[in-house]
Structure formats: C-alpha cells, structure tokens
Amino acid sequence: MQQARVRLAGTSPEDLDDICADVREIADSTGVALSGPIPLPTKTLEIPSRKSPDGEGTATWEHWEMRVHKRLIDIDADERALRQLMRVQVPNDVSIEIVLED
C-alpha cells in the first residue's frame, strides 16, 4: 500500500501540534496506520542589524530571529483518509506538504 508523507513547517509549535492531533484523529477514525509525528530539528534564522540608521556612533546591534519548527508524519494512503486530510483547516503561518510514496 502507498504511504503519504506529510511534512509540516511553521513558526508556532502549538499550531503544528494541533494539526498533528487532527491528523492522528483522522487516522484513528478511518483505521489507517500512522507513524509520527516526528519532530525534526528547529531551524533558526537570525538577522543582525545596526540600531543606528546613519552609521555614526558606537556599533550597537539588534538581533532578530525566527524559528521554523518542523514535523513529519507517515500515514497509509487510503483515499478516504487523504480526502479528510485535505480538508483540515491550516493556519496561514503553517505550510503543509503531502507526498505519496511507494
């Protein structure tokens, strides 16, 4: 049977966990096998910028960062389960990618 690999990425780990709970609920209701969610390493994007706009004075810096959290879920590619998976409400800051594998 084919497997569907679901990759979730977003800046809020709470939103990712909510979506993972929805996917687990879909798998339980349809009776398909599920493995995961597997937490992948968090990627930290950091941008240092000067506080002074004109470049004069002492070199003081601000550091802005954004953390991207990722989760990986493998689920059996049952037609009913995938159809329900496509209807899950996903927040704007979460990206979801579904890939079918043999």
Swiss-Prot record:
MF-aspect GO terms: structural constituent of ribosome; tRNA binding
Gene Ontology terms: biological process: translation
GO cellular component terms, A-Z: small ribosomal subunit
InterPro entries: Ribosomal_uS10, Ribosomal_uS10_CS, Ribosomal_uS10_dom, Ribosomal_uS10_dom_sf, Ribosomal_uS10_euk/arc
SUPFAM superfamilies the record matches: Ribosomal protein S10 (SSF54999)
Record keyword Chloroplast present: no
Keywords: Ribonucleoprotein, Ribosomal protein
SMART domains linked: Ribosomal_S10
Ranges where the record places region Disordered: 35-58
Signal peptide: none
Role this protein plays: Involved in the binding of tRNA to the ribosomes.
Protein family (similarity comment): Belongs to the universal ribosomal protein uS10 family.
Assembly with partners or alone: Part of the 30S ribosomal subunit.
Protein name as catalogued: Small ribosomal subunit protein uS10
